[in-house]
Amino acid sequence: MTESFNSDTRILLGRKLSGRYVLTSLISSESGTQTWLAKDLVLSREVAVVLTNPFQVINSDHISLFRKEAKLISRLNHPSIITVLDTTGDEDLEAIVIELVKEETLFDYVERTGPLSLTLALQITKQIGDALSYAHEKGVFHGNLNPKHIFLCPDRGPQ
C-alpha cells in the first residue's frame, strides 16, 4: 500500500489542505511519508508539507502518534532544528507544515564535492550533536537521521 502512495503523486498535485496549503511539487518520498513544496495562501509564502501515508489514516494509533510527534517537535526552538508551523488533517490526509529550507543537504554536498575535510566534518558533527542533545532534553528523538535530512545552512548551521 505504501507503494501506491509513493508512486502516484498526480492525485495530490494541486490539492488544497485546510483551505490554505496548495501542494505544488513533490520534494521527497520515503518511510511512509511524502514531503511537498506548498504555497501558503494565507501568508503568501512557500512551505514544506509532510504527508503521512493516506492508507494509515484508518489506523488511529498511527495518526495519534503522528499528531503527538508534531506537537512535541513544534515545541522545539533551536537554530539547527526546522520549525513546525502548523498541522492539518483533511479527509484522508494528515500533514505537518514545516518551514521550507532550500539549502543543500549534506548528502548532495558530499556527492558534489567529495569527502568532507576533517575540520568541516567536526564542525558539522558538533552542531548536529548540539541540536540532538537539545531535542533529547525535550523528549524528542529523530529516529531517521541521515545526510539527506541534514541541510547545510551557512547562516544557521546544519538543520
What label would you give each PLM region?
Residues 39-46:
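Conserved N-lobe loop of protein kinases adjacent to the ATP-binding glycine-rich P-loop
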Residues 91-105, 109:
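Conserved short submotifs of the Hanks-type protein kinase catalytic core
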Residues 23-31, 35:
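Protein kinase glycine-rich loop
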Residues 129-140:
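Protein kinase catalytic-loop region centered on the HRD/HxD motif
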Residues 28, 68, 76-80:
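Flexible N-lobe loop architecture of eukaryotic-like protein kinase catalytic domains
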Residues 53-75:
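AlphaC helix of the eukaryotic protein kinase fold
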Residues 124-125:
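Activation segment signature within eukaryotic-like protein kinase domains
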